[in-house]
């Protein structure tokens, strides 16, 4: 897809010190939040609307005001946002998404969080990455949203990784297709935070190895390449990544070439099956259906297979 007409080059980061002083001004009144939520739900007519698809999915009660404090172009079709979240009680688990309420837009967006819970704890910031489509919330993000734009967010989702200190150590295999990388990047970043805790010899969850399989049409649509490679280089004994492109038409640059192959194969996934491994899959429905079925056929317990489809 073509990129949006207006993009903000480079990530514009908000300062940590500004968070506390600005938080009060970001809060919406309860009546405003209620009106925003109910109006958006009632006016949404799409059969494939986020609110309809996720109507039975658990959500937190907190609807928090948030302000856009940073934006960047992650690919020709994906724009990332940093949101300063006002409510101090707002929290999420790695892998979850937010209902995204936009003043003046009747349709509620649904976007996976791609940052780690630690970033929210430290800076009161969450990060989203939104693909350009004709869906009203995505159009707003790409064409209308600016720094200091105000929205409201609420956490939901049953696809997450939230181990407790006493839990048994697990390996993770993350399988991402396209923008399905978003919740898996949140999980990967959370895993890296857990590894840093281990390195500092703190008490906490002892995570095993993490393998990311990431597929996109071309290298230009492989999001967060530098972030992912930085984590691989920081934890070479623990984190590994293989990237896959299915419709590449240009030459792959030298830095990425060692990490790039064709489509993800069943054998590659099968080689990582063990009783200590959890599988997280996020991508287009045909992809998630294929890999979850293949894992079941290879006798991976259903409770070890977590998947989420993006539309």
Swiss-Prot record:
Instruction: Report the leader peptide range.
Output: 1-17
Sequence positions that bind NAD(+) = 178-183
Concerning InterPro entries, the annotation shows: FAD-bd_FR_type (IPR017927), FNR_nucleotide-bd (IPR039261), Oxidoreductase_NAD-binding (IPR052128), OxRdtase_FAD/NAD-bd (IPR001433), Riboflavin_synthase-like_b-brl (IPR017938)
Enzyme Commission number(s) from the entry: 1.-.-.-
Could you tell me the keywords of this UniProt record? NAD, Oxidoreductase, Signal
Domain FAD-binding FR-type, first and last residues per copy: 50-186
Q: Which CDD domains match?
A: FNR_like
Annotated GO molecular function terms are:
oxidoreductase activity
A GO CC annotation recorded here is: mitochondrion
Annotated protein name in UniProt: Oxidoreductase NAD-binding domain-containing protein 1
Q: Which organism is it from?
A: Pongo abelii
